[in-house]
Amino acid sequence: MVALLCSASLCGDISVGDACLVSNIKAKCRDNLVTGGLKFHALKIGSRKKHWRRKSMRCSVVSMKSSDFSGSMIRKSSKPDLSSSEEVTRGLKSFPDTDSSFSYFKSVAGNLNLVHTTETCNYMLEALRVDGKLEEMAYVFDLMQKRIIKRDTNTYLTIFKSLSVKGGLKQAPYALRKMREFGFVLNAYSYNGLIHLLLKSRFCTEAMEVYRRMILEGFRPSLQTYSSLMVGLGKRRDIDSVMGLLKEMETLGLKPNVYTFTICIRVLGRAGKINEAYEILKRMDDEGCGPDVVTYTVLIDALCTARKLDCAKEVFEKMKTGRHKPDRVTYITLLDRFSDNRDLDSVKQFWSEMEKDGHVPDVVTFTILVDALCKAGNFGEAFDTLDVMRDQGILPNLHTYNTLICGLLRVHRLDDALELFGNMESLGVKPTAYTYIVFIDYYGKSGDSVSALETFEKMKTKGIAPNIVACNASLYSLAKAGRDREAKQIFYGLKDIGLVPDSVTYNMMMKCYSKVGEIDEAIKLLSEMMENGCEPDVIVVNSLINTLYKADRVDEAWKMFMRMKEMKLKPTVVTYNTLLAGLGKNGKIQEAIELFEGMVQKGCPPNTITFNTLFDCLCKNDEVTLALKMLFKMMDMGCVPDVFTYNTIIFGLVKNGQVKEAMCFFHQMKKLVYPDFVTLCTLLPGVVKASLIEDAYKIITNFLYNCADQPANLFWEDLIGSILAEAGIDNAVSFSERLVANGICRDGDSILVPIIRYSCKHNNVSGARTLFEKFTKDLGVQPKLPTYNLLIGGLLEADMIEIAQDVFLQVKSTGCIPDVATYNFLLDAYGKSGKIDELFELYKEMSTHECEANTITHNIVISGLVKAGNVDDALDLYYDLMSDRDFSPTACTYGPLIDGLSKSGRLYEAKQLFEGMLDYGCRPNCAIYNILINGFGKAGEADAACALFKRMVKEGVRPDLKTYSVLVDCLCMVGRVDEGLHYFKELKESGLNPDVVCYNLIINGLGKSHRLEEALVLFNEMKTSRGITPDLYTYNSLILNLGIAGMVEEAGKIYNEIQRAGLEPNVFTFNALIRGYSLSGKPEHAYAVYQTMVTGGFSPNTGTYEQLPNRA
């Protein structure tokens, strides 16, 4: 092969024609022209005429093989070409095979005027990797080390790929072992560089492993490497490792500098180890490495973070009097940190000092001042500060306005924040995604997911592309509200706007799925998260384990726990606490103890919550003795029991019947932890149940004596409620009487309320009335209106209307003014019992006593009128109320009216009223649709009923069991059994469980249509698959339809099954059997059934005689 070698530095005379003549030698070969290290194809010389005319060149023709490149063949240049890297790369790419490229690579390496770069070396490494040439790759890597060519991430990743090491840079510690085996031996510079690359990628653990290997191989890391490692470990709060590195560097003869010491102070300070930070500061002085202004600023920052504000001020004063004067960063740090601690006075003091020292306030410092004023609640001064800024020629920037908006939202001044937000553009500042995020976050945390989503959409319409933080903030609000549909739209729309979900995104979506019960979707998302290279954090997995346990998917929860190792996650104390709680809930004591012991062995020390969870498991499963043993172990392990610990063990002792032991434990508890309200509610019910009234009395009096304030009424209500639930009415009343009689409870009414409630709930309304009289008359308790209402409600529930009226009169006679709830109780009772006159009389009384009726009152009256058959009167009242603008109808207003009209055959009016609901801001609910569907169904208008069903689904109203039952019934009534069966299947597929009524309707419909095999299949399904016990209607329906179809033997079997089920047949049962036998031409069987019926004490009706053969 012939190549033309030219050098611009070697001047000679050559014409373009001569050059072209020379270039034609062996034109069929691949000729190369190298000019000052730049390569051109010989056939392209003509295109560079202008360049060649400017320069005279000396050239020589050299005959050689394509692989025979040597350094001597490339003429020396007096001046290296700065663009050589790009040209060398082009040269490497021009060769048809890797061997030629590698030869050219080595020849360039031998030329002193040409310099290989990271780009050329990486290209060569990749080309060699593709051909599997590891030895040559090792040569390239060694050259990079010797020539000190930067080894970047791509360098190492290419080598890792060639060695089949998967997992990226994170696998560096493992890859280094393989690299050495294949000749890639790192020097000190490479080790330092690799550690920096790992730290830059936040692989701190892996960086430390590489550091350890570096030390083992006898290399000494640089001071910069130690500093970088310390910074990385400091971010992870790994103080021991940071301080360990400080010692190690000294053993290797490296002397820490001011930067290294400052890093240590920052790490110690942020971890709250202020004394240790001061020791480092003292050591700096002792070793002649005096702290600089950065060191002092870092120390001030640490002291402020640890809330040691006085110490921070002392350091500041020391700086002022010393040689290291505070700089602008020092003042910004002081202003910012004291602002965070809401110390406005100090902020103003530092501001004054800053100005005295000649540091002119700028937009950054002014923004900090605005933040401090907002945190102090001085919003007027904060807004005035904006004017001061403008007067000084400093325009508030976006961060200033965002700070002010955040301050306003922090104190829930939403309207002011929105006003400022609306004025930003007129003030010359355009809101960014962050501004919108602030509002989205506020709405989300306030539970207003609608406004959060509207703000997110508004941001997009303004042309601001949402970032991942905005999406995550929106997802937070939607997840909190369980609005999975909108959350999915945002999540799956991320790709459309060029965003990639991060760990927070996935966490929010999994939370949302968990909230709506879509656990499988959450698990799928976890897999997707890992596939997309987004590593799940332990919080996400803990949440998922907890969700699975709550859904009783215990096995899957444990599988998720086992997968944590595969996900390279270390279980935390929260993980173990969740699993322990689950085991305790399922009564698996042994497994809980084993898990507890396992977590200790695996280096995850239990905390107080862990022990409390374990105690809860043991005490609920009658293992209180073991819990007491574990309590001693808890204290030995340095865990301090809290009030929850003692409450749990007291619960266990009381549950186990060890009331006296519980009392002793309670007295021991007081020496360490003061009991709380829960303690009393746990202990006293057991003490009272054991009839230890005197002991219970002493415990409560002692507790109240040590209380600073008298307990609220709710305290007594909850306490007596707990005692009633455990000890029963008699002992609870004895204890309560003692408390009231001795004035321990100053407001006896708060004790009377739970007693009345308990008695009424247990259907002992007369007893409630008696106790009410005893406490009010004998013990002098003055009942309040809520107590009267409770008693009146209980009496009316038990249909004791007259006594309730007496109590109502008593209310008025004692000076208590009945409220709307009192009247509503009585009005509802009158309406349900058909006492319309009394209802209207009381309704009028309300207005004369200035007790304003509410919507519930009006609804009760309307409902009462409808039930009494006075639909028109009810409509008149409705229209009168609608003329009053203060009345807002509800679904309970329309329900009785639509029902009354439907049952009266006035379906057109019912539909008209239904259509008018939305005009008054009342959206029809499922119950309203059910009433109307039932009305049309009963009238035989199945199409209208089906249309209403489709409409309710379209409008987002979820049908319930009643809806499907009504629809199935009306379709079967008109013979459209297939459609009825369709909706019955849809009912089951929707997750609803059909009841016996629904099964009866479809079985009867199939039977009437002579589809008896299908009817029997559903009959068996309800018994076996669904566990629903058929009632007499089910059996009667089957007997009747089987008999009509001539299947009298099967009908007889169903009759026998009635007897086995323990049900008593009625006249309709016998009539159905008689009819079946009569139609089948078996009169003797028909008369036999008739005889059985009469001898069984059943009275035949006209239907019986009509079915007997002699009447045929």
Swiss-Prot record:
Transit peptide: 1-62
GO cellular component: chloroplast
Effect listed in the UniProt record for changing residue 610 to I: In pgr3-1; Affects the accumulation of the petL polycistronic RNA
Pfam families for the chain: PPR, PPR_1, PPR_2, PPR_3, PPR_long
Key word Thylakoid present: no
Subcellular location: Plastid, Chloroplast
GO MF annotation list: mRNA binding
Coiled-coil parts of chain: none
Entry's Gene Ontology BP terms: plastid translation; RNA stabilization; translation
Keyword terms of this UniProt record: Chloroplast, Plastid, Repeat, Transit peptide
PPR repeats: 117-151, 152-186, 187-221, 222-256, 257-291, 292-326, 327-361, 362-396, 397-431, 432-466, 467-501, 502-536, 537-571, 572-606, 607-641, 642-672, 676-711, 712-746, 748-783, 784-818, 819-853, 854-889, 890-924, 925-959, 960-994, 995-1030, 1031-1065, 1066-1100
Family: Belongs to the PPR family. P subfamily.
PANTHER family in the record: PENTATRICOPEPTIDE REPEAT-CONTAINING PROTEIN 4, MITOCHONDRIAL-RELATED, RESPIRATORY COMPLEX I CHAPERONE (CIA84), PUTATIVE (AFU_ORTHOLOGUE AFUA_2G06020)-RELATED
Function recorded in the entry: Plays a role in the stabilization of the primary polycistronic transcript of the petL operon encoding subunits of the cytochrome b6-f complex.
Protein's UniProt name: Pentatricopeptide repeat-containing protein At4g31850, chloroplastic
Gene source species: Arabidopsis thaliana (Mouse-ear cress)
Lineage, highest ranks first: Eukaryota, Viridiplantae, Streptophyta, Embryophyta, Tracheophyta
